[in-house]
């Protein structure tokens, strides 16, 4: 795919020239009147469309963009659609957005989120991408704790393979962190968010300080110029440490403190970390960037290939693209496409509806998905029911073998931007029936520890997933589950020594550690105090803060990382409220310490106030970074140090599970079932059963009670705590507490679910919006008062 392309120009990051549509394609894009997303208000049963995609729900939201889960109408494949409001971005941010799209177009690796289609109008940009249903690695670690080294190795091999592939193409990511590592349905890694990526040339230094501070290389804090790959290598070292230990190697209560620790390069080695893993970390976390290992060298490391002696990790070789797959071509011809436009779109890399359909026809969203393609007919009769008629030149396609029902104008108009068309209720119903239940996909996951990076015969297609790694999502016994799910290791205490377990290792890059070899298979049930820690002194009199910043401040930029539906995610957290004080975690999210930022963004106000970089004055924005509800074991860290806030210098992403007609904050009606629908729908509602899915649960929120009795108890407790709620599904409530616009306002879901393989039901909590402190306070109170 790359052989047909000219090298990507390195964008001058200070250049503010207004970009043009030519950034996205060599041919002019169609204008906004070519695309009409239907308003959901046109019919109670209709869902909005963008081109050939039915928009299902919002799964992420920011200041200037939304991410929606969508289904490709012709193939039935799920995709993530990033909808970006270009009118809200300045010229510099637009340039970075277009650069991100250009870079995504040339990347074709099984562990990198695949771009399928780009739809552009005068005011909006739609990026249709691979949907990673497993969520973020960050959330997985919060829910399940650290990974065993065997599992971490499988994931890390995929990560290194993908990043090394980028470096092969002279592309540096510059924002590698656990939040930008997604998991697909088979628990394989998908690297996302190339918003800060750029092309590099050795000798032509980059000088932009961007990324997440805990993952940032020391030379970035020092304001030094860099080639590119070495900053990714440092970030990979932080990621490896995070996977294996469940905590960050460098942390602090504010940016100044974090900077000092990174520049010292000291980090603790947990007692359970193997010597091989420790030695590998020393190749990543080296203060001198010129002495840092290359990824080609890292691939040959002993730890990387344990259990893979016959399959040593090697640089990924991108296969030649297969643009003449007869099976897909014939299917598309039967839809009404012509062979000429199929070849033109593929060879020209148009990333239009034709190319997207071809890619999706060969794309497997899961190892469990068979080769059978279920195509959805688009009969002409449906046009009579259309509330948003298509342009006159657009003729509906059919799965009939007759290719005459096909428009021809887009061959002359360049890359086609699909129009939005209304479809009959029957067609929508058929599409809904084709959707594979999440629980089926979850329960059918394979368990294997190998992580081979296969050759892909086509960009983004038949991308055989690496053999899935073991999933720890299965419900364990009570004792095992509690200890294994105890989230992340204790943060190194400031100004005081921590209790050690016989041996302490303070590792400095290049120095010899005194850590003895330890088995990677240490029982997760071992007491938490048996952890190595370091005492880090703070020097408040030292120079603080970031390196010299650019003159042009950056505005928030859109992230193209596709988000997943949080409901069925393996990382949807339950509130653990049993027993004494909850455990603490190193992994608060939504705080500035975890925010990706650019050099132009200033933090002097917070530093002058000596506030922790996770605790700042509350933002009045309605787009706060509401995330998944977290288990009680992660709450006291927020209580003691961090408060979630909207400090992301990109989009403050917010996961929502709400109807399309809802936006921001709305008043919820207490206990009202949707009044629309016919008798059949009401009957189906009455007969609905709780979903069976994996989620983090505690003994306090599980019960052998009937689901309906549990719902009555939940409503009773909600009413007693002055919470408003709305019945979204039979066993799911949308809840609200506090005053909209105030810090105490929070929205969350409560759902009664069946625990797989157990004769128990559990209550799943998931935060939608509001600060983690507000959510923790009300959710813990409700969980404690439930009599289940």
Curated annotation (Swiss-Prot):
The modification Phosphoserine is found at residues 40, 91-93, 212, 274, 409, 456, 486, 493, 569, 571, 592, 619, 722. The keyword ATP-binding applies. Its EC number is 2.7.11.1, 2.7.11.26. This is Serine/threonine-protein kinase MARK2. Keywords: ATP-binding, Cell membrane, Cell projection, Cytoplasm, Cytoskeleton, Developmental protein, Differentiation, Kinase, Lipid-binding, Magnesium, Membrane, Metal-binding, Nucleotide-binding, Phosphoprotein, Serine/threonine-protein kinase, Transferase, Wnt signaling pathway. Residues 323-362 form the UBA domain. InterPro entries: KA1/Ssp2_C (IPR028375), KA1_dom (IPR001772), Kinase-like_dom_sf (IPR011009), MARK1-4_cat (IPR049508), Prot_kinase_dom (IPR000719), Protein_kinase_ATP_BS (IPR017441), Ser/Thr_kinase_AS (IPR008271), UBA (IPR015940). Residues 27-45, 418-432, 467-486, 495-504 have a biased composition (Polar residues). It is found in: Cell membrane; Cytoplasm; Lateral cell membrane; Cytoplasm, Cytoskeleton. GO terms for biological process: autophagy of mitochondrion; axon development; establishment of cell polarity; establishment or maintenance of cell polarity regulating cell shape; establishment or maintenance of epithelial cell apical/basal polarity; intracellular signal transduction; microtubule cytoskeleton organization; mitochondrion localization. Homodimer. Interacts with PAK5; leading to inhibit the protein kinase activity. Interacts with MAPT/TAU. Interacts with MTCL1 isoform 1; the interaction is direct and increases MARK2 microtubule-binding ability. Interacts (when phosphorylated at Thr-596) with YWHAZ. Interacts with YWHAB, YWHAG and YWHAQ. It comes from Homo sapiens (Human).
């Amino acid at each position: 795919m790359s052989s047909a392309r000219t090298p990507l120009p390195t964008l001058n990051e200070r250049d503010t020239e207004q970009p043009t549509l030519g950034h996205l394609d060599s041919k002019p894009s169609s204008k906004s009147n070519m695309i009409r997303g239907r308003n959901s208000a046109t019919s109670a049963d209709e869902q909005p469309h963008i081109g050939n995609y039915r928009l299902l729900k919002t799964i992420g939201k920011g200041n200037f963009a939304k991410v929606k889960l969508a289904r490709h109408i012709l193939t039935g494949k799920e995709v993530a659609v990033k909808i970006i409001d270009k009118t809200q971005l300045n010229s510099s941010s637009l340039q970075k957005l277009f650069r991100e799209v250009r870079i995504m177009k040339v990347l074709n690796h099984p562990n990198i989120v695949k771009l399928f289609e780009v739809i552009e109008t005068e005011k909006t940009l739609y990026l249709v991408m691979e949907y990673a249903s497993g969520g973020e690695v960050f959330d997985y670690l919060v829910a399940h704790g650290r990974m065993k080294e065997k599992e971490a190795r499988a994931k890390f091999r995929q990560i290194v393979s993908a990043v090394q592939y980028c470096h092969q193409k002279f592309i540096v990511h510059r924002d590698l962190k656990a939040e930008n590592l997604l998991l697909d349905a088979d628990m394989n890694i998908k690297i996302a968010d190339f918003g800060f990526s750029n092309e590099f040339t050795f000798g032509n230094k980059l000088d932009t300080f961007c990324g997440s501070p805990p993952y940032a290389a020391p030379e970035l804090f020092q304001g030094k110029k860099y080639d590119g790959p070495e900053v990714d290598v440092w970030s990979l070292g932080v990621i490896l440490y995070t996977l294996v230990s469940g905590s960050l190697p460098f942390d602090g209560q504010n940016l100044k403190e974090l900077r000092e620790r990174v520049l010292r390069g000291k980090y603790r080695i947990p007692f359970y970390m193997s010597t091989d893993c420790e030695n590998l970390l020393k190749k990543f976390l080296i203060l001198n960037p010129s002495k840092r290992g290359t990824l080609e060298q890292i691939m040959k490391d002993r730890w990387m290939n344990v259990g893979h002696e016959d399959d040593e990790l090697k640089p990924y070789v991108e296969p030649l693209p297969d643009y003449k797959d007869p099976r897909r071509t014939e299917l598309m011809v039967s839809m009404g496409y012509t062979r000429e436009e199929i070849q033109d779109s593929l060879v020209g890399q148009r990333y239009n509806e034709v190319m997207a359909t071809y890619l999706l026809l060969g794309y497997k969203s899961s190892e469990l998905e068979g080769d059978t393609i279920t195509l959805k007919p688009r009969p002409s009769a449906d046009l009579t029911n259309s509330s948003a008629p298509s342009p006159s030149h657009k003729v509906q396609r059919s799965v009939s073998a007759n290719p005459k029902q096909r428009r021809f104008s887009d061959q002359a108009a360049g890359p086609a931007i699909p129009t939005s068309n209304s479809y009959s209720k029957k067609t929508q119903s058929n599409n809904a029936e084709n959707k594979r239940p999440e629980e089926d996909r979850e329960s059918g996951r394979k368990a294997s520890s190998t992580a081979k990076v296969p050759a892909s015969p086509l960009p983004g297609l038949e991308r055989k997933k690496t053999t899935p790694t073991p999933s720890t999502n299965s419900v364990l016994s009570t004792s095992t589950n509690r200890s294994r799910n105890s989230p992340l290791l204790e943060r190194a205490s400031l100004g005081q020594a921590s209790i050690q377990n016989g041996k302490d290792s303070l590792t400095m890059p290049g120095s010899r550690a005194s850590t003895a070899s330890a088995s990677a298979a240490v029982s997760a049930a071992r007491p938490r105090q048996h952890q190595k820690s370091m005492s880090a002194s703070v020097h408040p009199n030292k120079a603080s803060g970031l390196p010299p910043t650019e003159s042009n401040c950056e505005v928030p930029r859109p992230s193209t990382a596709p988000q997943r539906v949080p409901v069925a995610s393996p990382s949807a957290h339950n509130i653990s409220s049993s027993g004494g004080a909850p455990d603490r975690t190193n992994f608060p999210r939504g705080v500035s310490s975890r925010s990706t930022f650019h050099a132009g963004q200033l933090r002097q106000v917070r530093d002058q106030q000596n506030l922790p970089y996770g605790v700042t004055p509350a933002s009045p924005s309605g787009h706060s970074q509401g995330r998944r509800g977290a288990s009680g074991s992660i709450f006291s860290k927020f209580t003691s140090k961090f408060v979630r806030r909207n400090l992301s210098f990109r989009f403050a992403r917010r996961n929502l599970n709400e109807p399309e007609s809802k936006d921001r904050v709305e008043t919820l009606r207490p206990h009202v079932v949707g009044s629309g629908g016919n008798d059949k729908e009401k009957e189906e509602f009455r007969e609905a059963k709780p979903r069976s899915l994996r989620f983090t649960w505690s003994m306090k929120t599980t019960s052998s009670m009937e689901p309906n009795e549990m719902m009555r108890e939940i409503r009773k407790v909600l009413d007693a705590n002055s919470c408003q709620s709305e019945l979204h599904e039979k066993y799911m409530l949308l809840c609200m507490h506090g005053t909209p616009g105030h810090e105490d306002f929070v929205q969350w879901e409560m759902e009664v679910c069946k625990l797989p393989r157990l004769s128990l039901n559990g209550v799943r909590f998931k935060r939608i919006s509001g600060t983690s402190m507000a959510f923790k306070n009300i959710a813990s109170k409700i969980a404690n008062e439930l009599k289940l």
